[in-house]
Amino acid sequence: MNKLFLLLSFLMGVVVLSSNYLVQFPIKYYGLEEILTYGAFSYPVAFLITDLANRSYGKLVARKIVYIGFAIGVSFTLLFSTNFADLISVRIAIGSGTAFLVAQLLDVQIFDQLRKKKWFKAPITSSFIGSTVDTFLFFSISFYATGIPWVTLSFGDLAVKIFVALIMLIPFRLLLGTLKAVKV
């Protein structure tokens, strides 16, 4: 394993942990508390990491990074932020892990199928589809029948994730040149 693989794996774990923490906090400005949480801003970085790993190493190594991120995220979420007496906390842990794993593995597969197209098609398509799957899996598993406005939160969350995914094309493109120069 080289340093880039370790760095991407570590960053994936950080993104998962940060997002799991930040999703608990609705944005309380401009009436957005019913629509949006802070987790929507950090989570799309996971797709950037997955797509960079996929472009650099291929889908098998990208999957390993997804599994490492999943293990870190679920382990730390269960250890530090899950109150097992509180059903919603357990549902968030299960929803987060399920949504992350399904969406990221889907992202890896879609990216791999589109990798020979123009540079932006694979990351934007895989991130868009992965974000959509992640959002609706997470919110439905975590908050269905709780009284929390999970449908409106999920649409607000998805809108931000798509916006951030578009912005993530900039670092993706810039880092492609760096990764090619390093030739991992």
Residue ranges and their predicted role:
Residues 5-9, 61-71, 118-125:
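Cytoplasmic-side transmembrane-helix entry/capping segments in multi-pass membrane proteins
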Residues 13-16, 70-73, 131:
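Residue-level recognition of pore/gate-forming positions within transmembrane alpha-helices
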Residues 16-24, 76-84, 138, 142, ...:
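Structural signal for membrane-spanning alpha-helices in multi-pass inner-membrane proteins
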Residues 1-55, 60:
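Hydrophobic transmembrane alpha-helices
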Residues 72-100:
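Helix-adjacent hinge/juxtasegments
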Residues 24-33, 83-88, 147-153:
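Membrane-interface helix termini and inter-helical loops of multi-pass transporters
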Residues 90-183:
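Membrane-embedded alpha-helical hairpins and interfacial helices in multi-pass inner-membrane proteins
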